[in-house]
Amino acid sequence: MNTSTNSSAFAPLKNDTFLRACLRQATDYTPIWMMRQAGRFLPEYRATRAKAGSFMGLATNTDYATEVTLQPVERFPIDAAILFSDILTVPDAMGLGLSFALGEGPKFAHPVQDEAAVAKLAVPDMDKLRYVFDAVTSIRKALNGKVPLIGFSGSPWTLGCYMVEGAGSDDYRLVKTMLYSRPDLMHRILQINADSVAQYLNAQIEAGAQAVMIFDSWGGVLADGAFQEFSLAYTARVLAQLKREHNGARIPRIVFTKGGGMWLKEMGLLDCDVLGLDWTVNLAKARAIVGDSKALQGNMDPNVLFASPAQIAAEATRVLDSFGTPYAGEGTGPTHIFNLGHGISQHTPPEHVAALVQAVHEHSRKMRA
C-alpha cells in the first residue's frame, strides 16, 4: 500500500522545538504537549463528538479526526499535535470486531483466547487502516507547519492484553493465564502484533507523521522477567523495523511504559530517541540511570491539574527543576519534553491546562537565561 506523501505537499515547520528536544538538541524553552490533549476535557471536542455520533465515528472520519486533533493546538500554545485515533485500530483491522459501548470501554466481539484463534491471526492489510493514514495527511496539511504531528500505536503487549481479555481488565487474569500456561501462544500473538505495529507506524510516517510514539500502557502490570520477555523484547522488535527518516527528515521514536520505572536501565538500551515516564519516577534519577543517550518526556501527575493555577505552576516548576539544567550547547545533550505522567482527565478545567502551558514555557525560559 502506498501511503507516501511528498514533503513538498506540506508547509515548512514554524515551531520545531519538540522535534529538536526529541533529538537532544538545545531549545530556547522546554516544549510541552499532553497525552490525550484532544479529548473530553475540551467543550469543542464534546461538540464534535456529538456530531460524529460515536467514538469510532469520530476516529474513522478524516474531517472529524482532523478537527479534534487541531482543537488543543488552536486553544493552547502547545508544541506538538498528536493524531486523534485509538490504539485498538490495529486489532480491529485483524478482524476482532471492535466496539465502544456508551459509558464503557472498548470491547472485542472475537477475543483471541485459544489456539485456533491464535492460528487465525495475521498482520492486517494496511488498506483497512487507510482512514488513519488519510487522517494523518489531512491533519499535517491543516496544521500548516504550526507544530509537528506525532503518530502513535499501542505496544505489542498492550494490544495483546486487550486482544486476549476482549476488553480492559482489572486483574489481567486471562492474558496472564495464557502467558504462564501457554507462552508459545502469547509469543505468537506478540510477534504478529510487533510486525503489525511496525507496518502501521511506518505507514503513518509515510502519510506525514513527524514523530511516532509507542504506548505500552499495560507493561507495568508484568512481573520482573516477564516484562523483559513479553513487553520490552517486542517493543524492541517494532523499533528495529521503524523508518529512521522520511523525505530527508529524522523521525524521532518515543516509548512510554506506564509503571515502567523499575526497568529504566533496560529501557535505556532501547533503540529509540525518547523515553516517556509516568509520575512515579524522579526525572533526575531517571536521567542518571538512562544516561544522556535518550531525551526524557514527562511526567507531572495529571491530577495536579485539579489544584489552583498557582499550585499547578509550582508543581510544573518542581518537575522542570527535577530534570535539571537543560542542554544549551552545540550538538546533542540531555533534553526534556514536558508532559503528564499519563493521559489528561476528562474532568480537567481547560483554563488549568492554559496555566500549565504558560508556567512550563515561562519557567523553562528562565532556566536557560
Curated annotation (Swiss-Prot):
GO BP terms: protoporphyrinogen IX biosynthetic process from glutamate
Class in the EC hierarchy, top level: lyase
Compartments it resides in: Cytoplasm
GO molecular function: uroporphyrinogen decarboxylase activity
Pfam families membership: URO-D
GO cellular component, one term: cytosol
HAMAP family assigned to the protein according to its UniProt record, in alphabetical order: URO_D
Assigned protein family: Belongs to the uroporphyrinogen decarboxylase family.
Name of this protein: Uroporphyrinogen decarboxylase
Organism of this sequence: Albidiferax ferrireducens (strain ATCC BAA-621 / DSM 15236 / T118) (Rhodoferax ferrireducens)
